[in-house]
Amino acid sequence: MPVRHIHTVLFFFCVIQFTQTLFADTPPDGNATIRRKAGNSEIVITTTNRLAGAIHSLTWNGKEFIDSFDHGRQLQSAASFDCSLPGEFWAERYNPTEAGSRSDGAGPTASSKLLSLRAAGNELQTTTRMAFWLAPGQNSSGRPALNEKILSDHLISKHVRIGFQNHDNIIEYKTTFTVPPGEQHTYAQFEALTGYMPAEFDTFWTFQPETGQLKPIDDGPGEQQLPVILSTKDGKYAMGVYSPEQPSPGFEHAGYGRFRFPAAKVVKWNCVFRVRNKQGIPAGEYPYRMFVAVGTREDVRQALVALVKKF
């Protein structure tokens, strides 16, 4: 068979396989656990069917780090797009979300669809077809949803590994967003990773790469350019995020966010990337690499020092 015919056959085989995966009727089991020793304890990460394979729990040294209440408060990923509309951008109006939709509430099922999951030892890989956060006809702060269906054609894949080089308390976290063809956008906002944490993680810090020290920061809300750490007051428990790929071109003063929601009794950090293209956001894959450090506040500081030296 001529080479060009082989390439054509392989291309159509891949398209067929992707389509079969996207529209598979029976999802894989989303209940999984990975773990690895870290210090005198171990980091344990748990996913659930309820959240279409998103991370429901992360524990270390007897402490839960994730506030998994509805289908938005997890360790998870989401994306937002402008639908090429002028004027104000409001993220939740077109907002594919890994763990499910707002309407899923605290219920037992997700509108998102888990397509694949592999978990072994300290390593987890998943692919999920994301639901829109808003259902058609719903609104966010008076701004109506732009999507016309609840289940999007956007995919999120993650590859999570507990431990990085000689650092047991660093979690390497890779995400790949797949933007489908046929959509028209000029602005994309990828919340590559966010962590919703219990309210007791109530002190916020930035990591200063030049000195390796931490500096207190107010609760914003919003983003700035330095890695963030959320900690308990006594410093015994903390979580921080760092990405060597920050900042996004043209958005040098953003990337790491921190938020406090007193009424909901939850706090949040995120790591956000942005793409703006007046000619249109191309369909395809958008990969990002991040590192999440867990432990005492000092453990997390030392982990970020090591990461900055590495990258």
Model-identified regions with their sequence ranges:
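Bacterial N-terminal signal peptides
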Residues: 9-19
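Beta-strand-rich recognition/accessory modules
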Residues: 25-41, 46-48, 237-311
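Acidic (Asp/Glu-rich), glycine- and aromatic
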Residues: 51, 59, 167-210
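Beta-strand elements of well-folded, non-transmembrane domains
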Residues: 130-132, 160-164, 177-181, 292-296
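Bacterial N-terminal signal peptides that target proteins for export
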Residues: 1-10
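Amphipathic hydrophobic-ligand
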Residues: 146-157
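Active-site/ligand-binding surface loops and adjacent short beta/alpha elements
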Residues: 192-195, 200-261
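Acidic-aromatic substrate-binding/catalytic surfaces of carbohydrate-active enzymes
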Residues: 37-141, 146
